[in-house]
Regions:
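CBM-like, beta-strand-rich accessory domains located in the C-terminal region of large
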Residues: 1-146
Length: 146
């Protein structure tokens, strides 16, 4: 990427990091932005991922789709629920991943953290129509209490 930006904000209740890059500009004529917010009161992480087309190509991108992938560590198991994905973390901890916009599916992937022994893992994939979402996907990861 030629252009990258990062900004950080901190308050007593929230920490925010916003990042953007144009790595896909040459091939797809888009820039990407991710806003991560950690709510220190509600103990959750929220994300907003956005695709920005070059102005003159906005109408061409309308029929495209965007996809986000979240690869889970091998020690984390997951179950799809009606409103998201329940993540079970070692130590009897549970987190709930939810999203707004698009369709979520679970797929197989490969973890190469231990280079000698690749492991099969699960990844969560959210795919959304740019036209329906205006190029945005919102997601949230929060503690789940039974």
């Amino acid at each position: 990427p030629r252009n990258t930006t990062i900004s950080c904000e901190n308050s007593i209740t929230e920490k925010i990091v916003e990042l953007s890059h144009d790595a896909y500009k040459k091939d797809y004529h888009i820039s990407v932005n991710r806003r991560l917010s950690m709510d220190l009161v509600k103990n959750c992480v929220m994300g907003k991922d956005t695709v920005f087309p070059e102005d003159n190509l906005k109408k061409n991108l309308i029929d495209s789709s965007m996809m986000l992938s979240f690869h889970l560590h091998p020690s984390i198991s997951c179950k799809k629920r009606r409103n998201g994905v329940l993540l079970e973390i070692p130590g009897d901890k549970k987190m709930l991943f939810t999203h707004k916009g698009g369709n979520l599916r679970l797929e197989k992937s490969t973890y190469t953290g231990n280079f000698n022994q690749p492991q099969e893992i699960t990844k969560m994939v959210i795919e959304n129509s740019v036209k329906q979402s205006e190029g945005k996907i919102n997601w949230k990861l929060e503690e789940f209490i039974d």
